[in-house]
Amino acid sequence: MLDTSIQALINKWQKYLALQRNYSNHTVISYNNDLKHFLEFMNYYNSELVTINHIKTADIRLIRSWLAKRNCDNFTASSISRGLSAVKNFYRFLEKTTQLNSHIIFSIKSPKKTKLLPKALSEDDVVISLEHIEEYGNVKWVELRNKALLVLIYASGLRISEALSITKLHLQNLEFIRIIGKGSKERIIPWLPIAKNLITQYLEILPYKLGDNEPIFRGKQGKKLQPPVFNRELIKLKHFYGLPQHLTAHSFRHSFASHLLEHGADLRSLQELLGHKSLSTTQNYTKTSIKHLEAVYTTAYPIKK
């Protein structure tokens, strides 16, 4: 249970994240869920209605108990780390907007996350996917939407959230797409004709009228297409054609990066295309490419021990 004044603060915090920090809707929802989990634990821990004073005076024992509870509930290290980041973010917001001074929560370090290498698809699996994605949709414009979106992600390396934010304004430039990605970082990506042509064909038969600033990829009811809806289309494709279990919309972004590396792209250029803040993040793709080369060597090299 929360004091009504706290809910008002949470609402202001969410607006701050979305409008001033330019966080994606997905991140705002995730952060809100993490904060809700923390405050519910605080309510249980104190056995009384949570007030702003409870939040300000939360000690290190309470915070560590909450993190331990998440660990016992089988949250991954990544989820625990994100949850702590969300709560810290809320406390920073309180520092800006209330009389809260530096809080003990900022002394707590996030658990180390296990680094998972990005999983790419083989070029053959990508070709199969692009050739057959149109079979799932039941309506012509939906079928064309699915193909246009999948080709766009693989041809440009966009995150699914970025691809679903493309508007008609993005189509006005014939040579490149200007994308605002994570952390409001801007990057420029060349248009591939096949992607732009498919999008143009899709828009010609889309049964909904859109303004220039509205996202072009729509669901069957005319609302903005959401990532889980598109991934459900990919699940059908994956099951029918026996494609890898890790096939998702995001795996086509990984495939874009890995295949470019395998064909000679340099890391700095790839970093710019992917919108990575750190080169070390991009370097993870070299590890997957090396694994690919090792597999090719093992199966195809004529001289074996």
From Swiss-Prot:
User: Gene3D superfamilies given for it?
Assistant: 1.10.150.130, Intergrase catalytic core
Q: Which GO terms describe its molecular function?
A: DNA binding; tyrosine-based site-specific recombinase activity
What's one GO-annotated cellular component? cytoplasm
- Span of domain Tyr recombinase: 116-298
Report the active site residues.
Answer: R159, K182, H250, R253, H276, Y285 (o-(3'-phospho-dna)-tyrosine intermediate)
Where is this protein found? Cytoplasm
The UniProt entry, under SUPFAM superfamilies, shows: DNA breaking-rejoining enzymes (SSF56349)
Q: Which UniProt keywords apply?
A: Cell cycle, Cell division, Chromosome partition, Cytoplasm, DNA integration, DNA recombination, DNA-binding
Q: Where is the Core-binding (CB) domain?
A: 4-95
User: Do you know which Pfam families this protein is assigned to?
Assistant: Phage_int_SAM_1, Phage_integrase
- What's an example GO BP annotation here? chromosome segregation
How would you summarize the oligomeric state and partners of this protein? Forms a cyclic heterotetrameric complex composed of two molecules of XerC and two molecules of XerD.
Function field:
Site-specific tyrosine recombinase, which acts by catalyzing the cutting and rejoining of the recombining DNA molecules. The XerC-XerD complex is essential to convert dimers of the bacterial chromosome into monomers to permit their segregation at cell division. It also contributes to the segregational stability of plasmids.
Family named by the database record: Belongs to the 'phage' integrase family. XerC subfamily.
Which PANTHER family has this protein been placed in? Answer: PHAGE INTEGRASE-RELATED, TYROSINE RECOMBINASE XERD
How is this protein named in the record? Tyrosine recombinase XerC
Q: Taxonomic lineage per UniProt?
A: Bacteria, Pseudomonadati, Pseudomonadota, Alphaproteobacteria, Rickettsiales
The gene is: xerC
